[in-house]
Amino acid sequence: GYAQLKENMTKADFKVLCANVYGEDGTPIFDANYTYTTKSGVKIGFFGMETPEAQTKANPALIKGLKFDTDLKAVAEKQLEALKDDDVVIALSHLGVDDSSKPYTSYDLYNAAKGIDFIIDGHSHSVMAKGKNGEPIQSTGTKFANIGVIVIDNATKKIESNSLYEIKEDTAKDAAVAAAAQKIIDRIDKEYGAVFAKSKVELNGAKAPNGNRDGETNNGDLITDAMLWKVMQNKEGLTVNEDHVVAITNGGGIRAAIKVGDVTKKDIKTVLPFGNTIEVIYVTGTELLEALEASTFCVPESIGGFPQVSGISYTISTGAVYDANAETYPASTYYGPKSINRVTINSINGKEFKANDTYAVVTNNFCAEGGDTYYAFAAATSKFDTGVTLDMAVMDYITKELKGVIGEQYAAPQGRILMNPFKDVKVSSWFGKYVIDLYNDGIINGTSATTYAPNDTLTWAAALK
């Protein structure tokens, strides 16, 4: 959060640049730009730009008082004017190139403000030496997967070339840094390296496609089951019947896979590294439906807010258009739904979903405070934090409920979230359930948005189904 950021800033012995994040007094909390002059006299101007998505990608409760300027064009043009005497101007952006981040991507920045010579980008973890249409945008991925190189000609004072160099196991490392890192690794291994369980199945840690940000996963099922189980151990504190208690966590918070074999505490903390605590919020069925609609607005494209669930069965009509409000949610880059077009809640704990009923949603404190697309949760007037972290809940669930073994029940997603890509198939129609079930079982596929056919020659069993 902001408090931690301020503390870190006092320890930094280097420039941190960001032109579009302001404090309560309306002034940038960082230096906006900086000019570096090389030994050969080339003046390189840098300015920083943070994604406005940080308003909901970070826990909103931890960044109160900060304002994120969404007018990338105006901010960039101001910086270009300040750096107009420099030979080369480079934007250091944390914007990314994902479609779900529009209109705040590095493409949007480059196209909006003329005069940027190069963009060094982050946020989407993309690996690219140039943009899709040749834009001078470079991104090195994540976790030091690559080193980006830019070559500037001293004579012309222009960028001559740029490239990426992949870091491999045999790449030479700085000895002092490697030694310092190893001390930290050894300390973590000592504290969290003990085996506490085994897994008979691999739990999906991918983002997309076919990952935690664009569909149901067995990892999401396990985590939300654990969250729900943990709260139900002390259900006396709940104000609704247990058949009205569900769990939701954002797929973007699931960061790694669990392999077959021994499972350590370190493995679980790698899957859930943020230290989020479990909160319980009370919402109406209408508010729950809004949260699901908003958090799947771009699916089948990936989105960090994708709702992994327990106790809920829902269908996403991916062929339907998201009916967005004209204005974004407060302090957000996301648009809430004007109407519900894409999501249908099929059941809650096997029973009929009722829009006017009150439901207890077990979620993480990030979503409860309105992180990602969950403004409907932030608006809840009744909520409480259990103080239990997600990783501890998962470890307790595996140890006590699963008896230390993640078994075949988690070999595959359990069919809680269904996809309906057909524009002319409504969940409420007499044939809707049958078509959607056949599609999600892999028996049929769409040949267009309105027609379908078997994927292969059908067996009698498949045909009769």
Predicted segment positions?
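Short connector loops/turns at beta-strand edges and beta->alpha or beta->beta junctions
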Residues: 50-55, 366-369, 443
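Catalytic centers of hydrolytic enzymes
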Residues: 57-63, 79, 141-419
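Extracytoplasmic Gram-positive cell-surface binding/anchoring modules and repeats
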Residues: 420-465
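Acidic, metal/ion-coordinating pockets
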Residues: 1-170, 214, 219-229, 237-240, ...
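Extracellular/luminal Pro/Thr/Ser-rich low-complexity repeat and linker "mucin-like" segments
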Residues: 44, 89, 184, 188, ...
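Single, functionally critical "micro-switch" positions that shape active/binding sites
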Residues: 122, 283, 441
